[in-house]
């Protein structure tokens, strides 16, 4: 009798796993543009102003164009970089979307002089 209950649990577990795999496949298709609807338009992220004497200043004022799936990938990259930095360094880091491509920045506390 216990064997039969174990078999039923196995069948339920397989059905749950199959359902999860199907949902995963559907989500992957939607992310890759295989979804039923069109992809949402790009989101614009304005860059911060820089020094006017810089020769590349005109380029920097252009907005960064990102599509939603690129933003998701950036978030994954930031999280991985942050976890790696925390695991190999005793310092404290924050995620930052900088115009120089830095995914994380170290936080350096201010120490008041005595």
Curated annotation (Swiss-Prot):
Q: Which Pfam families match?
A: SOSSC
- Tell me which GO cellular component terms the UniProt record holds: nucleoplasm; SOSS complex
Annotated Polar residues bias: 1-10
**Region: Disordered, residue numbers:** 1-61
Indicate the segments annotated as coiled coil, or none if absent: none
Gene Ontology biological process terms in this record: DNA repair
Record-stated family? Belongs to the SOSS-C family.
Which PANTHER family does the entry link to? SOSS COMPLEX SUBUNIT C (PTHR31526:SF2)
Protein name as it appears in the record: SOSS complex subunit C homolog
Query: What organism is the protein native to?
Result: Nematostella vectensis (Starlet sea anemone)
